[in-house]
């Protein structure tokens, strides 16, 4: 199994470099299994939001498309899916992924806004220091 870097996924979805987009897509089609680290998905969201100025709905559609790649094995997929649900409800994707990855562990922060967003979403495991 081969792990796929962020830039391969971004090139495929934004198609801003047609030759690399085509090579990346062809590579994925030829693979039985590829590994997608959750940190790669975190970077994909950040790049699409910050560099390409895509909105939350567009980013979620792209992330769902990436997760639907038949050959993809996603690291901690349950946490990624939970983070995507929280992101859809307005939480920052990085914060959501950090909290989802913590599982049932208590999550502490200095970020009052994060604590408030989590409280509104019914996430009780977050504590403000």
Short names for language-model regions:
Residues 45, 49, 64-67, 84-85:
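Amphipathic alpha-helical segments within well-ordered protein domains
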Residues 38-44:
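Short, conserved active-site loops that position catalytic residues or coordinate cofactors/metal ions
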Residues 115-121:
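Short loop/helix-cap segments at secondary-structure boundaries that form the rim of catalytic
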Residues 56, 69-115:
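Active-site neighborhoods of divalent-metal-dependent phosphate/nucleic-acid chemistry enzymes
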Residues 7-8, 39, 112-113:
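Alpha-helix/helix-capping structural signal
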Residues 1-36, 51-61, 69, 121-129:
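Short, well-structured N-terminal submotif of metal-dependent ribonuclease cores
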